[in-house]
A protein has these predicted regions:
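C-terminal lobe substrate-recognition/regulatory segment of protein kinase catalytic domains
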Residues: 343-393
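A conserved short helix/loop substructure at the end of the activation segment
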Residues: 391-403
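Activation segment/activation loop of eukaryotic-type protein kinase catalytic domains
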Residues: 244-301, 330
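Short beta-strand micro-motifs within the conserved protein kinase catalytic domain, predominantly
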Residues: 170-181, 189-190
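Conserved catalytic-loop aspartate of Hanks-type protein kinases
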Residues: 309
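Structural motif in protein kinase domains
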Residues: 188-204, 325
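Glycine-rich ATP phosphate-binding loop
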Residues: 123-146
Length: 435
């Protein structure tokens, strides 16, 4: 049979090869840009201008994406990933990198800082909810604790921008003006953990009314903090410094937990420094802390470490167990004075105290009554003991977050098995009305 000249001769037994991709034909909506490509004008209405002091003369178009390990090289397009996934869709799923914004863009987004301020219990600094570069965001104004050069900020921002985890609120970018740094975070719909546990309008109600909902929060926060300590900083010992119940967002409608203010301590110059001069300077500076979450060594030196993060996390776990604040004051009628009660002390009494009722009885009496006594006692006791290990006074005796996250994951699985066993049968109907 004659073959037409317009059709190529093809071996019926051969396997067709995937076509080579042309880097010059990258889709326009791709989130991966080359270093020489100019940012799209649709990403922000405010033109990019050089940063104000102390970064005068530098371009704000710098993004940490140039050094991010999440870039998708065009050479991998020669390999077929899925018949349903295109290169552009893969690029769209890659996390975006944090960037340095023009201060004029922050000023325009906040209406020259005259816009309605966001009521945030997670931070004592001023904050605004606004739209920055087309994204719903929260802008926090914080004071720089030490002078930082341009290279210092770029180095820290590069490391932080490579860190992406489901339990961490994403940092979109920063801007610096004078002695203040403006941290731009994504806005997450939900409420902070402290408000979820303690509703002043209705103290008998909580959205976290089941044991599994609280175990989910504990697991999310443990793995998020483990990621910050052991993965996010790569070769740097990253410290969060602001671990507290008001700094944890319980998302809607999934009721998962996200840690707020990741990278704030690093970018504000609040982290530990090396050398005798740096130690003396840190001792002279004022430091911020929340009562009940500060470890003994942090209160003595003002220096935050990973061990002080572990201490604060242990306090958060005890909050989840009881629903109470870390420290409260109770009036003592015999002395006529108020007595400070720590959730750490009550936890130790619950698992280590004496009495005829035993550990189970003391634990049931100590745990949040709004759980309606429906929780696995064995898992609750083990979780309490893990938290007490985290809040030991000697920082060297505290475990690291990798060990803690592993223990809590096992307790989560054990609690899940318990929840499946006690789950109410759906095929049985119950009526409490009189017949």
């Amino acid at each position: 049979m004659a073959v037409r000249a317009s059709e190529p001769v093809r071996n019926p037994n051969s396997v067709p090869r995937p076509a080579m991709s042309d880097p010059s034909r990258t889709p326009r909506n791709s989130s991966s840009k080359s270093q020489g490509e100019k940012p799209s004008s649709s990403s922000s209405k405010t033109p990019k201008t050089p940063l104000s002091d102390p970064f005068r003369g530098t371009s704000s178009s710098y993004t940490a994406a140039s050094t991010s390990s999440y870039r998708l090289d065009s050479s991998v397009a020669t390999t077929s990933v899925s018949s349903h996934a295109s290169l552009s869709s893969l690029r769209d799923t890659l996390p975006e990198s944090a960037q340095i914004y023009d201060f004029s863009e922050i000023r325009a987004a906040t209406n020259n800082f005259l816009g309605k301020r966001h009521s945030s219990t997670s931070s004592s600094s001023q904050s605004w909810r606004c739209v920055v570069s087309g994204k719903d965001a929260l802008v926090f104004q914080r004071k720089l604790r030490k002078s930082m050069t341009r290279s210092d900020v770029l180095q820290k921002l590069t490391v932080i921008s490579k860190s992406h985890f489901t339990s961490i609120v994403k940092l979109l970018g920063v801007s610096i003006s004078g002695e203040h740094i403006y941290l731009v975070y994504e806005f997450v719909q939900g409420s902070d953990l402290g408000l979820c546990l303690r509703n002043k309008m209705n103290p008998d109600f909580t959205v976290l009314s089941t044991w599994m909902s609280r175990m989910q929060i504990a697991t999310d926060v443990a793995h998020g903090l483990d990621y910050i300590h052991n993965t996010a900083g790569l070769s740097i010992d990253m410290v969060h410094k602001h671990v507290k119940s008001s700094g944890i967002i319980v998302t809607e409608p999934s009721f998962n937990a996200k840690i707020c203010h990741f990278g704030a301590a690093e970018l504000c110059g609040e982290t530990r420094e090396d050398g005798p001069q740096a130690t003396a300077a840190a001792a002279e500076r004022q430091f911020e802390g929340v009562r009940g979450y500060m470890s003994p060594e942090f209160k003595a030196t003002g220096v935050a470490t990973q061990k002080s993060d572990v201490y604060a996390f242990g306090v958060v776990i005890l909050e989840l167990m009881t629903g109470k604040e870390p420290v409260t004051y109770k009036f003592d009628r015999s002395s006529g004075n108020y007595r400070l009660i720590s959730v750490i002390e009550t936890a130790r009494e619950a698992v280590e105290g004496g009495g005829e009722e035993g550990v189970e009885g003391r634990l049931r009496r100590w745990t949040d009554k709004r759980l309606r006594d429906s929780f696995p006692v064995d898992a609750a006791e083990k979780l309490t003991r893990v938290a007490l290990q985290c809040v030991q006074e000697d920082p060297d005796k505290r475990p690291d977050m990798k060990w803690v996250a592993g223990k809590i994951s096992k307790l989560y699985l054990a609690s899940k098995i318990w929840a499946e066993r006690v789950k109410f049968p759906t095929e049985i109907s119950v009526s409490l009305a009189p017949r």
